[in-house]
Amino acid sequence: MSSHPKVKKAIERATDPGLRVDNWGYLIEVCDLVKVDAEDRGQYAMKIIEERLLKQDANMILRTLSLVVALAENCGSRLQQAISSKHFTGILYKIVDDSQVHVAVKREVLKVVHQLADSFKNDPSLKYMHDLESKIKISHPELISEPRVPKKKEMSKDREVEEEKELAEALRLSLLEFEKTGSRQQVQQPQQQQQQQQQQQQQQQQKLYPQNAEAQQQQAPTVIRKVRAMYDFNSTEQDELSFKKGDLICVVEQVYRDWWRGTLAGSVGIFPLNYVTPVTEPSQQELAAERAKDEQVFAQKDNVDRLQNKLREAGNADITQDQEINDLYGSVSPIRPQISKMLGKYAQKKEDLVSLRQILANAEITYNQLLSRASNAYAYSAPPPAPMTGPAPTPGPQSPMSPTAQYTSPTNTQTQMNGIPNPPYSYPLPQQTQQIQQSEQTQQPLSQINSPQNYASSVGNTNYTGTNHIPQPLAPYPQYTGMSMQSIPPQQPQMPQHYNMSSNSNAQ
């Protein structure tokens, strides 16, 4: 195994104890150098890493552990076998078992071992890392920092009753507030006077009895609106909320005894209480002090602008000799820490507003979908329009009615002529009306209509040129027109007449 100065220099730079956080640019540079020759350079890199892990510098050990993870994830199976070897896992356990090593470093070692064991779980040849994790958990259970996830137990009935009472009280107060706002225009001046008197009385009582005022403030119930994550939590079910250590979660409601519902970065879900710590709301005095500091920073805006203009106009001149620039710089420099805090605070507020906007957009989309689904369901379930019911239209007084025509409507008459049923209550066209009147004038008795002679003549008659004409024989029985058969006048039965088909055809 030959030496590789470039690899050694890159490892020393990536694991420099002066680094307070991991520099992934340096870590990737080491990975690129090792991947050129994974077998030779990999062994050399592991030798240097082992030497730096045995140092007593905690910061160097933390940076080296990050390098180990980077090599395992980016440099292939050669480095994975070297990292999961019995020799290297023994070095990691030696760090955990050393009483002089800080507990934070030991927990970081266990965290890296857990990450590598989870990454190597599909390869049986890399089982030593999994064995090391089990060994550390058995011998040093105090290093397992993450608490157990509690079970989702329903809230007790007393708690539910208490929440119902709180909800009813909130509704009552909101109604009272609404009534007050409705009548405020009528009694605005007397109310202002009463409020001023009450405020003066409260101030006098606080001056005379400051202890009572503090006790009342302490007795006021604290409402937890935000919590901060103490550990990482990965959701295992669909309704759970995943978060990282340090995330700020907005509390929505209590779902179970040990689980609350919250929002984070536009996501909504439940989270265990033993993974978070409440964020106390600042008092009125703290808010006033914070506003005063912000106003002091904003008051220096003109000086900052003047300093920028002076520096821009100075160009290449020696600004150290300019007394005005030195004075402006001296007045602006003290507010730099406060500006950094304000940037973080307003960045968090912006993130919260963006998260709320996303939640509102999702709720609006869901509402529109439900509304559309409900309207479609109502449209499909609506009953069909009821058919028109009423007396059939009767012809005018100028058209005479025959005894048979009174039992059939104009629609049925047209059906008997053409053989095609029309829609109910449809009136015939003028041409059809003329044909109906002609047929009424030459109408025969019912017995003759059903006679064989008329049946044969109707079959042979194909010269009709009316609208929608399809030659069909007449029905041998009277059509049903919505009336009972008893209402048809009785007809005397007649014997069928004997006739000659040839003579009948000649007559036509």
Curated annotation (Swiss-Prot):
Occurrences of domain VHS (ranges): 14-144
GO terms classed as biological process: protein transport to vacuole involved in ubiquitin-dependent protein catabolic process via the multivesicular body sorting pathway
CDD domains: GAT_Hse1, VHS_HSE1
Nucleotide-binding as UniProt keyword: no
Every SH3 domain range: 222-281
Low complexity compositional bias, start-end: 429-449, 483-497
Pfam families, alphabetized: SH3_1 (PF00018), VHS (PF00790)
Biased composition (Polar residues): 401-419, 450-470, 499-508
Record's subcellular location: Endosome membrane
Biased composition (Pro residues): 385-400
Functional note: Component of the ESCRT-0 complex which is the sorting receptor for ubiquitinated cargo proteins at the multivesicular body (MVB).
Similarity remark: Belongs to the STAM family.
The protein's assembly and partners: Component of the ESCRT-0 complex composed of HSE1 and VPS27.
Protein name: Class E vacuolar protein-sorting machinery protein HSE1
Organism: Kluyveromyces lactis (strain ATCC 8585 / CBS 2359 / DSM 70799 / NBRC 1267 / NRRL Y-1140 / WM37) (Yeast)
Biological classification of the source: Eukaryota, Fungi, Dikarya, Ascomycota, Saccharomycotina
